[in-house]
Amino acid sequence: MPRPTGKKFDKRRQQQNPLFKRKKFCRFTAANVDHIDYKDLETLKDFIGENGKITPARLTGTKSHYQRQLDTAIKRARFLALVPYTDQHKA
C-alpha cells in the first residue's frame, strides 16, 4: 500500500511542533566556558526539567563535551544537597 502524499499529509507535517523550530546552540561554547562548576546553581537549574531529570543534549543543543561536564556537575550538586533530586516533594 503506498504512503499518503496528498495535501492533507503535508499540512499535518508542517503543523507538528512549531516550538522546536529555533536553531539550537551550545551556551557554553558561545560563552567560552572551560569548566562547568557545580556551585553555579542558576546555570544548572536551566538544564533540569520539571520533574528533576537532566534535559538531554538533543533538546538543549549542548555539545557532548559540555553535556558530560553538566551531568557530573548536576550529580555533584544533588549529592551535596544544593539541588533537589526531584521537584515533586509535598510540603
Swiss-Prot record:
Species whose genome carries this gene: Paraburkholderia phytofirmans (strain DSM 17436 / LMG 22146 / PsJN) (Burkholderia phytofirmans)
Keyword flag RNA-binding: yes
HAMAP family on file: Ribosomal_bS18 (MF_00270)
Name of the protein: Small ribosomal subunit protein bS18
Family: Belongs to the bacterial ribosomal protein bS18 family.
Pfam families: Ribosomal_S18
UniProt GO BP: translation
Keyword annotations from UniProtKB, A to Z: Ribonucleoprotein, Ribosomal protein, RNA-binding, rRNA-binding
Cellular component, GO annotation: cytosolic small ribosomal subunit
Record's subunit section: Part of the 30S ribosomal subunit. Forms a tight heterodimer with protein bS6.
Function: Binds as a heterodimer with protein bS6 to the central domain of the 16S rRNA, where it helps stabilize the platform of the 30S subunit.
Positions of disulphide bridges: none
Molecular functions (GO terms): small ribosomal subunit rRNA binding; structural constituent of ribosome
